[in-house]
Every structure is written in structure tokens, then in C-alpha cells.
């Protein structure tokens, strides 16, 4: 017997709580708002100057003329800063009760107790809870919310901040640079290897809210770190904006894995800039799960600066009714013997649209570089669409580039075979989809793989929205 599809109320992340903020800026983006944010955070003068210059760039820069439709995004109707509590807490008991209830529903304290070396929880514009195992601090690892790192590690912070993604990079990087708040700052010292994941969780609760976290990760020579972030928001009838910037520096022989499981509600514009600089024999892995949102535009980028540097992106995108997932990856080869891999898995149903948009660039010095790209799309009905838009730039003749793209539908033969074994059509389709995404989920820690599979099943049953 076919399972009954749950309604939106069964989507456990779709709830929203009463506004418990202690400060909320006026809607719209002005110089006064930017100054107010910087003043409330008691930032140094150079950061205020950085914000104000970024604001001017934002005003001047055009909207992207490619990708999804941004015509309904109204910058004047967004709240750019909401302060939910007075301080970041290290004890879960000290987090304000209303906020704690939200994260209890999301399972954050339980997850921390089970398998995390450190966890950070951001609610609206600020990190409300942050904790890390003491032994990691003793190894010299820094894991803080980004605002605390600016106050407490200013010299290190200033050395790397905006060095990978400058404010002038694109319009939404400029916007983030003007109003950024929260995010994670991680520094792993030379030859320190961290096996247990560090996690951050980002939650938008308010309507017409903008969340603009800024994450900065530095893996020093020979270091290793695994970072996981999760993102959710309630279901509203009006739009919210998530516009983050992620900067990562992978030094010589270092390794960083950055995993994202985002599950935004379908009223969220998710417009994110993620980039890493990878030095000699460094290794950067992006593992990127894109579910939900009204529109996602996100292309994790590896700039391979040192000889032997490696970069990889493994991503999955799922687009349902009224959703556009415009995602992909960028691999910029600037040094000899560099290598990159892009594996993109996309699923569309109920008229959803998935787009793979990628760039692979081989510079003149990138002799012996190689790249392999695989794009697989599964379309579940006749209303849904998929596009693959690769862009390759080659400036030397000693490289290797392989690109494979495949679009398929669930075949009648597959369904017939499974249904002949007593499985319903709905369950058979679900089994085919789960097999399709298995190369992605097997790369996740077990707890995240279980959660990802559960979210995909909700998408299949039409419950997320």
C-alpha cells in the first residue's frame, strides 16, 4: 500500500517562533544601518571603513544578468540585522529559553553530545551558542564565532579577512561585506589534524530577514580539519535572503573538507560566495547538499595556487515546485600538476529547475594539470527541466580535461521490475532516487547521511515547502 504523503506541517524545520530579539534594525539598507551594526559590535575603525566602502560598491554594482530570476528580491524590504540575545553562551543552559527550544527541536545539543568536537549555533544575525572541547584549545585550535575572532584575534583575523573574497568580487559579496554578522572562524595550527567534525548551524526565524554570516577557515601547513554546516528557515509567504561569504586558506600539505547540508524553506533566496586558495600539495573538498530555497545560486570555487594542489566538489541539488537550483563549481588551475574533480548530482520534480553552471580554467603556468567533470541529472516528470552550462578556459596545451554529462528519467522498465516485486510505484521511485544520490550520501558522516536521506524522502513526498 502506498504511503500517505505528509503535509507541510510534517516538515519539522518549517516552524517559526515568536520574535525574541533584543534589537532589530529598520528595514532597508542605508549607511546609518551599517554604522549601527558596527557600533553595536564595538568594532575597530578599520572594519567600519571596510563596511562603508563595501556599501558603496554594492550600490554601484549591477545585479547578475544570468542565473535565476531576482526581480522579486526587494533590498528595501529586508531586515539586515537582528540581535537575538546579549551574549554568545558557552553553556547550553544559559541560552535564552525561547531560542533554546528552537535548537532543541532541531537536535543541536543532542548532536553535540554524540559526535562533534565543537558546535556553533547562529540564530538570525548572531551566534547564540558556541562550545569546543577543551583538548582542542590546548592544541592551539581556534574555533570561534567570527565576531569574537575579530575582537580577540584581530591580527590573525585582519591578515586573512577578505583576502580570498574581496568586497568587489560580486554584488552579493559586497552586500555581505557591508552587513556581515556571525559565522565561524577556524584556525588549525601547523601539523595539527582534527578528525572529529566542527559544526555550525544557521537558523533564520523572522520574516523578511537577511542572514549574512561570514566564515573564515585557515588550515596551516600540514593541518587538517572537517567542518560541517547546516541551514534551515521557517515557511513564510514573503521572501528572506541568505547571502553568506566563505573564505578558506589551505596552506602547503593541508587538508580541509567543508560540508553543507542546506534545507531552506521555499521563500529563501540563497545567494552565496564560497572560495578557497589551495597552496602546494594542499587538498580542498567541498561537499554541498542543496535542498529547498526559492532560488539557490552557489558555485564553490577552488583556486589551485601551488604545485600539486587538489580541489574537488561533490554536490547534490534537488528542485521541486517553484524552485530553481542554479549550482555548480569553479576550478581555477594556476600551478603545474594541479588536479580537480567535479561530481554534480541533480534531481528535479513538479516543475522544478536544476542548472549545473561550472567553470574550469587552466592558466599558462598550469602544465600537467587535469580535471574531471561528471554531471548527472534525474528528472522525475515532464514538467521539470535541467540545464548543463559548462565553461572551460584553456591557456596551455599540456592539460587533461574530461567532461561527461547525463540526463535521465525514471524508466518504465525500472519501475515495472520493482513493482513486480510487490513494491508500490511511489516506493519504487524513491528507491531509484536514493540509489542515484548514494555517491553523495556515502561521503557524509553517518548522522548526516541519515538526515540527508530523510530530507530527500520528504522532498519525494511533496512535504517540504
Curated annotation (Swiss-Prot):
It comes from the Bacteria. One of its GO terms (biological process) is iron-sulfur cluster assembly. It holds the Pfam family SufBD_N. InterPro entries: Fe-S_cluster_assembly_SufBD, SUF_FeS_clus_asmbl_SufB, SUF_FeS_clus_asmbl_SufBD_core, SUF_FeS_clus_asmbl_SufBD_sf, SufBD_N. Belongs to the iron-sulfur cluster assembly SufBD family. PANTHER family: FES CLUSTER ASSEMBLY PROTEIN SUF (PTHR30508), UPF0051 PROTEIN ABCI8, CHLOROPLASTIC-RELATED (PTHR30508:SF1). This is Iron-sulfur cluster assembly SufBD family protein SH2035.
